[in-house]
Amino acid sequence: MKKFVAVLALSLVAISATGASAATKVTLTPQNKVSKKNPVITVKLSGLPTTHGIYLSQCMAPKVKGEAPTACNPAPASKLWVSAVEADQKMGATAPTGKVTIKVDKYFKDGDCVHTKCIIYVTNDHNAADDRSEDQFIPFKFDGLLPF
């Protein structure tokens, strides 16, 4: 009976640990008609992790589904570190409240968002770098350009 209770307890811990890792909800505005003259996307976040932050980056969509992107925009305005953790904010992370924006480019080193699919890549920050549970690939496109 003791073994049964121990196994049951471990099972419940495992179930609750996996169920608690829901991904952050990320909404981009605009998503399908980003202005070529003012290429700024407003990012709305909810369900952010409470123990670490996330990174958002403009990248080329990965060639193989499920893999991390290999070409991301190196411009500082095209990357964001967002965290609800106060210590992270003191080190430069953006608070997830209010207006969070990211500037995107049609072209960047090793990237072409005019002729190929680009994404906002969401991933856990350096405090949870091995945890892939937040990885998201959110497509966007510029106004008047190729439909995806």
What residue spans do the PLM features occupy?
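Secretory targeting and sorting signals
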Residues: 1-22
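Extended, solvent-exposed regions of the mature portions of secreted/cell-surface glycoproteins
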Residues: 22-148
